[in-house]
Amino acid sequence: MRGPGVGSGLSGERGLSGKEAGADTEVAELLPFLVPGARADLQAAAAQHVLALTGVGSGRTLLAGQTALLRALIDLAVAPIPAPSRDASRALVNLAADPDLHWQMLAADPELPVRLLRCVLDPQWPWAEELAAVLANLSREPAPCAVLTEKLVAAEPERLGLERLVSALCMPSYNASAPLHYLGPLLSNLSQQAEVRAFLLDPDRCVVQRLLPLTQYTDSSVRRGGVVGTLRNCCFEHRHHKWLLGPQVDILPFLLLPLAGPEEFSEEEMEELPVDLQYLSPDKQREPDADIRKMLIEAIMLLTATAPGRKQVRDQGAYLILRELYAWESEPDVRMACEKLIQVLIGDEPEVGMENLLEVQVPEDVERQLQELDQQEQQELAQERRDKGAPRT
């Protein structure tokens, strides 16, 4: 395969080897053109070729385990213009989208997370969005996510860690050349780690309060979904529920508002709702992304894990919003999640000693039965989705 627009090949004497060539030959031909000091036009063509390879599974397999080439690609991605850092960055996005390559990328450069984050958090870096996507992809799997978290926590004293990441996420104008929407899913993935949740839920930092307005961020479902996923993960920490639901944070209206539609309520019902959910305009739209709607419901469900949480969610009229959502919802799995939450809100309280649903010890035989029921439910939902998409006869 020849580099795009290079005529007879990168070296001027021989062309790039084809996909069918062995990995050793491929790396031998590509690597000299990717390293610093290579001629600019040949370096650009080599980066384009690697980008093309990363677009298909066979190409990613070809590159897998080639430590020197991966390291050169990483160096190129963080190199200043005029280096072809954009193509190198996009190649890293594709590589990081393959979970099987995460460890190879981290092995090629153990400092990869910090190096990429340094560019992502540079307000002048033109390809910061691509590198944010690399970090978001890398952090999807638990083990690489833990490694990434360790690096970010270690970088915190230099303000290259979580605090600066949150600041950039909460400031859409942070980088005029890059929207940084992928900081949303990056933070969501990182918040699977206990250390990150502890940072986010630190009352002295006011991080959660800064994230809440982004549940209504209309310019990007990627950013919005990442923030909602982060908030949902924070809701697993039931010891913070009182603070989250209390006046210092007041999280519930921010979770309910995207689920609310234009439906009218009686005056009596209206008084049950938080002020922000009263008298909504007739053109009020619900969250358009089904996955985000489900995460919002899941976050509220987690807040009902304790008896005080259930009471506060009930007292703020959540049932009214969910009742109308259930009547409107067409996605089977979201509708099922909504139904389960409604059942918690209208059902009887658990018996003494079982008030905290996150701490209840479930016997193994009951757990197996629940897993079987869950599998059956998932099969029914899958069938419902298939039936929904089937052409009419």
From Swiss-Prot:
- Biased composition (Basic and acidic residues) is annotated at 382-393
Q: Which residues are annotated with the PTM Phosphoserine?
A: S221
Question: Gly residues composition bias: which ranges?
Answer: 1-12
The membrane spanning regions, by residue number, are none
Disulfide-bond pairs as recorded: none
**Entries under InterPro entries matching the protein:** ARM-like, ARM-type_fold, Hgh1, Protein_HGH1_C, Protein_HGH1_N
User: Record's Pfam families?
Assistant: DUF383, DUF384
Task: Cite the residue spans of the region called Disordered.
Answer: 1-21, 374-393
Domain of life of the source: Eukaryota
Q: Which UniProt keywords apply?
A: Phosphoprotein
Family the entry assigns: Belongs to the HGH1 family.
Entry protein name: Protein HGH1 homolog
Organism of derivation: Rattus norvegicus
What is the phylogenetic placement of the source species in the record?
A: Eukaryota, Metazoa, Chordata, Craniata, Vertebrata
